[in-house]
Design a protein with these regions (language model features):
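Short, positionally conserved secondary-structure boundary motifs
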Residues: 46, 53-119, 134, 153, ...
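C-terminal regulatory/effector modules of DNA-binding transcriptional regulators
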Residues: 119-120, 129-196
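Residue-level signal for the short linker/turn that defines the boundary of a DNA-recognition helix
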Residues: 15-16, 43-46
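Recognition helix of helix-turn-helix/homeodomain-like DNA-binding domains
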Residues: 26-43, 64
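A structural micro-motif recognizing beta-strand termini
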Residues: 107-113, 127-129, 141
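Surface-exposed alpha-helical interface segments used for non-catalytic interactions
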Residues: 5, 46-49
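A short, Lys/Arg-rich alpha-helix, primarily the initiator
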Residues: 1-16, 20, 24
Length: 196
């Protein structure tokens, strides 16, 4: 169960309005709306304790469980020339150790990363970031197209390299990186494959 579900369930069972619920918890109405809209789940310890008393449950456990659910945001091309699809396909629950390594999953289409053991329909777990070290596998936005590639920096060039010899590497100058634009949007932390 997520925090917003817990709050709305309590609100309903006690016949409270959003305003009354916010007052009961001791927060502003705008903060309460952020909580029930899922925009804010990082709560101060004092608020977690207050919520636990009001709701008569262990809110900290609910928040830990919620933090372990990671969305599958759509598809990314292991190749070039595919629009980034931002539809939420579902959620995957991760163990506590893995949950903190990243932010979301993307489903891979294409075969350009098979040399790195990333195959069609695999799920890559991505840590949202704007920079990666040379040699890392990253999600890269080229204009409005997302791709997964190894990223290298050499002699003022950004090189996007497939790990399948049938695909050529792409080389971009700093000017092209700014003009196109080309942006790193995430670091691939690990691959998940379902055998169903």
């Amino acid at each position: 169960m997520q925090l917003k579900e817990l709050l709305l369930q309590y609100e309903s069972s006690h016949n409270l309005s959003h305003i009354e619920m916010a007052e009961e918890i001791g927060i502003s109405l705008s903060t309460y709306y952020r909580w029930i809209n899922g925009e804010s789940t990082k709560l101060k310890k004092s608020r977690i304790e207050r919520l636990s008393r009001v709701l008569e449950c262990d809110v900290e456990s609910v928040l830990e469980e919620e933090d372990r659910l990671k969305p599958i945001l759509g598809k990314v091309k292991a190749g070039y020339d595919l629009w980034a699809d931002q539809d939420v396909e579902g959620y995957i629950e991760l163990g506590q150790a893995d949950a903190h390594k990243g932010d979301y999953f993307l489903r891979v289409t294409g075969d350009s990363m098979v040399g790195s053991h990333i195959y069609e329909n695999d799920l890559v777990y991505v840590q949202q970031c704007s920079q990666v070290e040379s040699g890392n596998i990253a999600i890269v936005l080229i204009g409005e197209e997302a791709t997964i590639k190894k990223v290298y920096y050499k002699n003022d060039l950004m090189i996007l390299e497939a790990s399948n010899p049938k695909y050529e590497s792409k080389f971009y100058t700093l000017k092209e990186v700014n003009d196109i634009p080309i942006r790193i949007i995430g670091l691939v932390r690990f691959v998940r494959r379902d055998f169903v």
